[in-house]
């Protein structure tokens, strides 16, 4: 970003700078100059006015926070540590572009003939992708509100995401495989009235001359008649022009691009909630726009990169694969072999598709490293960057990784939360950019989560809790003001998200995770509140009390549940009954891997269910049992009736 000089707003002959805080994010009115040209910014500025809150690297932004964050957090130093002196933020797009769709549109113009998406050998160019997204935006109309999109690993989902954003709507991915009642509850919770249709099958998706992306709706999303909630107005995806195709997409008419308030919601995603209902997180456009700009630099993306789309499209990790790629002129690769469950097939696909960037859940990476070690193999030569995140990395696997022929590959550990928009902290653990270690990784080492990215403000609060601020903080939880107030706080006139994670800071500024302040867990890299699972299980008529906690089984983080049967319930089949009951109500990651029927739970001195104590008492012994080795016996305390959820 070019150097910018700060000028002050003249008020009655006096020069001054006006800075105010709005309810969400930072607003300001100031006058600054860019290469001698004066520019104005104000709380009502649109993206083409270069609103300061879209440019957290701007000197005025940093000036606003002088003295308001601890001295140990230095945004300018963090920037140099990641990118090196002299590197700019928007490498592949105009630095003046701030909105995500503006960045995508500019990328389409620069790389129109290059492949944007590759799916099972079929190629969708940037020009075609831009035309489809633009046509969908026209169908949706201006500001369509929350739009539900079936989240499946196909190009349609990407077109849906970009089209909804281009229309000024809020993208809401919904897994077609989750139970209909939960799906309906999610759509009702966010007031969704519009859904996208999807293609009927591979033959409809591709025609003789290339991709068509046809799409009449099949089955109304599988929503069951009689369920409470809004009826969806359904919008079909457009087709590309081609032989025998109806409704062809033409070149979009030239004109002034639609300007959208950066505080408008960009997407809604659901996180686990202690009440038994998921919490919809509302992320504004300014948050995803500034984050994607940082991630392009963090990953060092160029048009020559080929990025695998691996993550579930129901979770925000997929955005860090899709959006930086499609605003850098790189190629996004979707391939079913990525989810085949076979490491040999996965590796053959990576080699065949010439993948350069892998973004993997840490749990998957751990297993992949074991496979590579046992087979004495390494990743294909095309891979230059592996991004991991979602849970703590295993130091033993890091030692194995270092012993492989991986010195040329960046291994980037990342940290973030849905409420702070994708990645907020990162560190190179191995490879050409990693700091040299004094000794190899060993069991018991704590793996750091890294430094804050340039757009992120951080603060270590009471009990060493990590607070994250800056323009990437979400608006809050839709329709849940109390939950929003509990997790989003104003400290020293800055709005922060309370992560609930305890951290420590090393002398070099790198943070290390030290545990949770609450009972939240990570399962398959997804945040889970055990209380949500407990609330669901407590609804089973045969259960009188329940405790849910995390355990490690076969090297994987899983949920385990301990249930106390009601009098008269069939204890011998209760575990299977509860499992079937849950599968009809919640996503698969909320179904415990092991459900154990027990006569009683362990309680604390205050009478609350002790999850850890119950697990310590009732977990089976032996390797792979999930029981903590050497755990002291827990004294028996009779269970009290009807303990549906304690936290």
Where are these regions (language model features)?
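Conserved pre-ATP/AMP-binding loop-to-beta segment of ANL
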Residues: 252-270, 277, 301-307, 313, ...
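Conserved AMP-binding/adenylation subdomain of ANL enzymes
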Residues: 279-306, 316-356
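Conserved S/T- and glycine-rich ATP-binding loop of Class I adenylate-forming
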Residues: 147, 164, 195, 265, ...
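Adenylate-forming
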Residues: 200-213, 217-224, 232, 296-298, ...
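AMP-binding/adenylate-forming domain of the ANL superfamily
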Residues: 79-268, 283-284, 290, 398, ...
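Core catalytic subdomain of AMP-forming adenylate-forming
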Residues: 125-126, 152, 191, 417-418, ...
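Short hydrophobic alpha-helices that are characteristic scaffold elements of the AMP-binding
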Residues: 162-167, 189, 315, 326-328, ...
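Conserved AMP-binding
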Residues: 151-156, 175, 301, 311-318, ...
């Amino acid at each position: 970003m070019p150097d910018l000089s700060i000028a002050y707003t003249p008020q009655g002959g006096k020069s001054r700078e006006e800075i105010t805080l709005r309810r969400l994010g930072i607003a300001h009115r100031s006058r600054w100059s860019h290469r001698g040209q004066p520019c104005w910014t104000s709380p009502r500025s649109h993206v083409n006015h270069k609103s300061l809150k879209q440019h957290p690297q701007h000197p005025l932004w940093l000036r606003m926070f002088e003295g308001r964050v601890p001295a140990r957090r230095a945004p300018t130093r963090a920037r140099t540590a990641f990118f090196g002196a002299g590197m700019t933020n928007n490498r592949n797009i105009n630095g003046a572009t701030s909105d995500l769709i503006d960045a995508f549109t500019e990328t389409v113009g620069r790389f129109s003939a290059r492949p944007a998406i590759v799916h099972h050998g079929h190629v969708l160019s940037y020009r075609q992708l831009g035309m489809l997204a633009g046509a969908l935006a026209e169908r949706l109309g201006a500001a369509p509100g929350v739009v539900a999109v079936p989240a499946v690993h196909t190009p349609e989902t990407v077109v849906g995401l970009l089209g909804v954003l281009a229309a000024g709507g809020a993208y809401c991915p919904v897994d077609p495989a989750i139970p209909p009642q939960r799906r309906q509850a999610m759509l009702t919770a966010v007031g969704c009235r519009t859904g996208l249709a999807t293609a009927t099958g591979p033959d409809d998706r591709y025609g003789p001359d290339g991709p068509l992306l046809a799409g009449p709706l099949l089955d109304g999303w599988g929503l069951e008649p009689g369920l409470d909630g809004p009826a969806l107005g359904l919008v079909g995806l457009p087709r590309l022009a081609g032989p025998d195709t109806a409704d062809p997409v033409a070149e979009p008419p030239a004109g002034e691009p639609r300007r959208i308030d950066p505080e408008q919601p960009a997407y809604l995603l659901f996180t686990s909630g202690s009440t038994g209902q998921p919490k919809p997180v509302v992320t504004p456009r300014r948050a995803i726009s500034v984050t994607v700009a940082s991630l392009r630099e963090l990953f060092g993306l160029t048009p020559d990169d080929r990025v695998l789309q691996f993550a579930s499209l129901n979770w925000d990790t997929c955005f860090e694969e899709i959006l930086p790629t499609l605003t850098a002129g790189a190629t996004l690769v979707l391939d079913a072999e990525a989810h085949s469950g076979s490491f040999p097939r996965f590796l053959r696909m990576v080699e065949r598709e010439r993948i350069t960037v892998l973004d993997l859940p840490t749990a998957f990476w751990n297993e992949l490293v074991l496979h590579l070690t046992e087979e004495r193999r390494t990743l294909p030569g095309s891979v230059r960057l592996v991004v991991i995140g979602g849970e703590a990395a295993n130091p033993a696997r890091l030692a194995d990784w270092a012993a492989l022929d991986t010195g040329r590959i960046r291994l980037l550990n990342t940290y973030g939360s849905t409420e702070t928009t994708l990645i907020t902290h990162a560190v190179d653990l191995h490879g050409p950019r990693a700091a040299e270690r004094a000794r190899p990784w060993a069991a018991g080492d704590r793996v750091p989560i890294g430094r804050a990215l340039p757009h992120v403000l951080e603060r270590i609060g009471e009990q060493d809790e990590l607070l994250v601020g800056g323009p990437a903080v979400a608006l809050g939880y839709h329709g849940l003001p109390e939950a929003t107030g509990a997790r989003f706080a104003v400290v020293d006139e800055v709005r922060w998200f309370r992560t609930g994670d305890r951290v420590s800071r090393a002398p070099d500024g790198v943070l290390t995770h030290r545990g949770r302040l609450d009972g939240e867990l990570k399962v398959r890299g997804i945040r889970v509140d055990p209380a949500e699972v407990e609330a669901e299980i407590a609804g089973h008529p045969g259960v009188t009390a329940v405790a849910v906690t995390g355990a490690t089984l076969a090297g994987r983080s899983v949920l385990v549940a301990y249930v106390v049967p009601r009098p008269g319930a069939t204890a011998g089949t209760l575990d299977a009954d509860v499992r079937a009951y849950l599968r009809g109500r919640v996503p698969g990651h909320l179904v415990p891997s092991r459900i154990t029927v027990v006569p009683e739970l362990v309680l604390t001195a205050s009478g609350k269910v002790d999850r850890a104590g119950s697990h310590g008492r009732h977990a089976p012994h032996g390797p792979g049992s999930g029981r903590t080795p050497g755990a002291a016996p827990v004294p028996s305390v009779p269970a009290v009736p009807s303990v549906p959820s304690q936290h």
